[in-house]
Amino acid sequence: VGSEMCIRDSAGAIFGGSAWVSTSAYFIGMAAIIISGIMLKKTKMFAGDPAPFVMELPAYHWPTLGNVLRSMWERGWSFIKKAGTIILLSTIFVWFTTYFGWVDGTFRMLDESEIDSSILAAIGGAICWIFKPLGWGSWQATVASITGLVAKENIVGTLGILYGGGDGTVYQNIAQAFTGITGYSFLVFNLLCAPCFAAIGAIKREMNNGKWTAIAIGYMCLVAYCASLVVYQIGGLITGEVGFNIFTIVAVAIIVFTIYMLVRPNKYLNDNEVKIDVKKVAASK
C-alpha cells in the first residue's frame, strides 16, 4: 500500500498523472526479482542443486459477498490502525522536527523561510551527500526516504509537510523540486530499497537469523541504489540533464556487470552436477 501511494503521488506531482509510471514500477519490481534470482544463483554462496517445490493449489471458486466484505473490512481496519498509530506519530515527529530548530542560538518554532535551520534539515543535510549521485541529494528527499523505513506511506506525508502541504500547492512545489529523471530515480530507489520496519520484522521471523536478515536488507538497499544510479546517470545523459562524469562510468559498469552475470554459465551448478555423477558411478560399482 505504501509503495502504491508513493508511486501514485509521484505520478501525479511530477509526471502529470501518467499511467505508465505505475505500470513501469510494477515491471521494474518484477525484473529486479528475476534478475536477482538469476545472478545470485550463479554465486558460490547461493549455488546448489535445484530443490523441488510442490504447492497444493486450492479449488478456485467465485468469492461470496460475505467473504469479500470481511476481507475488505480486515484490510481496511488494519490500515486505519496503522494510519492512526505509526503513521500519525511519525508524521507528528516529522512536523515537529521540521518547524523547530535553533536560530541565532535560540531553540524556537520556525517560520516557513527558516525551515533550512530545522532539526530535520540538520539530520538530512548530514547524509544527503550519499544520494547526490542519484539526482535527489536534497535534505527533504533524503529524510522522506528515511521516514519510509517506518512505513512507506510516510514518504508521501513527509513530502507533503516539507513541500507546503498546508497551502494546497504541494504538487507544484514537488514538481519544481524534481525533474522527470530525478523524480523517477527517487521512485525507483524507494520502490526497491528496504521495506518498512514491520516487513523487516517479518523477514527476521521467517529467516530466524539476524545475520541473513541484515544481508537481505543490505542487498535490497544496494540493488535500489544501483538501479536508481543507472536511471539518473544514463537517463540524464540521454536527456542532457547530466554531463559525463565518474558516476556515469559507474552506472555503465553496473549495466555491464549485470549483463555478464546473466549470460555467464553457472560454473557452480556444473561442479555440483559432476559431483553427483561421480557419486552415482561410485554407488553403481
List where the protein language model places each region.
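Alpha-helical transmembrane segments of multipass membrane proteins
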Residues: 28-37, 90, 94, 98, ...
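Extended, low-charge hydrophobic alpha-helical regions
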Residues: 92-222
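Alpha-helical transmembrane segments
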Residues: 21-36, 248-254
